[in-house]
Amino acid sequence: MKKKILSIVALVFVAIFALQVIALAAQSSGISPLNNNVLSSFTDFSISKTGNSEVDVNYTGYPNITTGATITVTIKKNTFLFFWSEVVNETYVVVGEKYRNTYSYDLSSHGPGKYRCNVTYTISGSGGADDVIPFEKDASY
């Protein structure tokens, strides 16, 4: 009876170890999904000491395939623990296979604290379904 219990416990430990290895391998593969209409994108969010924030947006599509994008920028302020208050919500519609811009927002009227920026690109074109690319970053001042 003891051998049977020990065998079952050992089997459970081996299974748990194997699943952790599989999960770790899947997590750190670094493989990016293939996009239909966009070759690359870059986004960044920063806030100066005076409360001026900048959101850098940049995408490069495929020639004769990418037609444009809808870029949604949302900035929220952490008000208490896990509660967030939206302070910026802007949507920009752009045309073309490439786009680069820096959006500036004055957050000083909302006071110092922790802010979270979410940017969502919805990039359209003839390459297939729209590509949806999310971005999230926290910054404080």
Role assignments for model-derived ranges:
Residues M1-I5:
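Positively charged n-region of N-terminal signal peptides that target proteins for export
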Residues A10-Q20:
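Bacterial N-terminal signal peptides
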Residues L19-N36:
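Sec-dependent signal peptide cleavage junction
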Residues N36-I75:
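Short, surface-exposed binding/anchoring microloops in extracellular/periplasmic proteins
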Residues T70-F83, N118:
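Short beta-strand segments and strand-loop junctions that repeat across beta-rich extracellular domains
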Residues V73, W84-K98:
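Solvent-exposed serine/threonine-rich low-complexity stretches and specific carbohydrate-binding patches
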Residues Y99, Y105-K114:
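Surface-exposed, short loops/turns at beta-strand junctions within beta-sandwich domains
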Residues G127-Y141:
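Short beta-strand elements
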